[in-house]
Amino acid sequence: MKPTTIASLQKCKQDKKRFATITAYDYSFAKLFADEGLNVMLVGDSLGMTVQGHDSTLPVTVADIAYHTASVRRGAPNCLLLADLPFMAYATPEQAFENAATVMRAGANMVKIEGGEWLVETVKMLTERAVPVCGHLGLTPQSVNIFGGYKVQGRGDEAGDQLLSDALALEAAGAQLLVLECVPIELAKRITEALAIPVIGIGAGNVTDGQILVMHDAFGITGGHIPKFAKNFLAETGDIRAAVRQYMAEVESGVYPGEEHSFH
């Protein structure tokens, strides 16, 4: 199978073809996703909650991310694999580069970091040294204590303009992908249209170039609070492989996420 690359996603944006992505944490699920043609995966620091049982992503370490990245890579050798740099792993550009090298050696193709314009020098540091970067704006879970909980971001003109400014700054610094989480659909549309790079949404409506879901949300095995943007595809299909195919089909057609999964 031909490897999926950032160029593959760039072509999807150019062709206005929506694409699905998903989190993965181990060999078995990564292989299953790849076998069904879902070839863009993220080893997210969400593993702190879904795999380790913490109440936030903050306890996750670079070693944790590297371990799970290596497992996923073995299951999906040709996927485009993103890996989060976890909380306090990129406080300085130099620290970011050192930790990015660790997860890249484990098998990642790209690192994802949360934050806006303050990350410009870090993004430049990484991309100039051959480390591809995916930005992450909106509800950035590592900032949960600043936000006072998991809340929609970017509502109102000032907040929306700031997120757009952040997105443009990250792109100008060299970021090649952007994740937008829990923002109003109208703002997601503005940002997606303003950027040349692909934008992946989660809780950002069906107007972004791609979608991502935490796999546990997609299969209805999340404990506790279920996010508004989540959909249990396993409940509809009764089979994990069929659920993966249904998720991909609904993303590609624009059926998911629907109005009931979106914010304004």
UniProtKB/Swiss-Prot annotation:
Entry-linked SUPFAM superfamilies: Phosphoenolpyruvate/pyruvate domain (SSF51621)
Organism superkingdom: Bacteria
Keyword tags: Cytoplasm, Magnesium, Metal-binding, Pantothenate biosynthesis, Transferase
The record's free-text note on cofactor binding: Binds 1 Mg(2+) ion per subunit.
EC assignment: 2.1.2.11
Family classification: Belongs to the PanB family.
UniProt-listed HAMAP family: PanB
The organism's taxonomic lineage, starting at the top: Bacteria, Pseudomonadati, Pseudomonadota, Gammaproteobacteria, Enterobacterales
Chief subcellular location: cytoplasm
Database matches in InterPro entries: Pantoate_hydroxy_MeTrfase (IPR003700), Pyrv/PenolPyrv_kinase-like_dom (IPR015813), Pyrv_kinase-like_dom_sf (IPR040442)
Gene: panB
Residues that, per the record, bind Mg(2+): D45, D84, E114
Pfam families xref list: Pantoate_transf
Protein name: 3-methyl-2-oxobutanoate hydroxymethyltransferase
Biological role stated in the UniProt entry: Catalyzes the reversible reaction in which hydroxymethyl group from 5,10-methylenetetrahydrofolate is transferred onto alpha-ketoisovalerate to form ketopantoate.
Binding sites annotated in the UniProt record for 3-methyl-2-oxobutanoate: D45, S46, D84, K112
Cofactor(s) demanded: Mg(2+)
GO biological process: pantothenate biosynthetic process
PANTHER family found in the cross-reference section: 3-METHYL-2-OXOBUTANOATE HYDROXYMETHYLTRANSFERASE (PTHR20881:SF0)
Quaternary state and interactors: Homodecamer; pentamer of dimers.
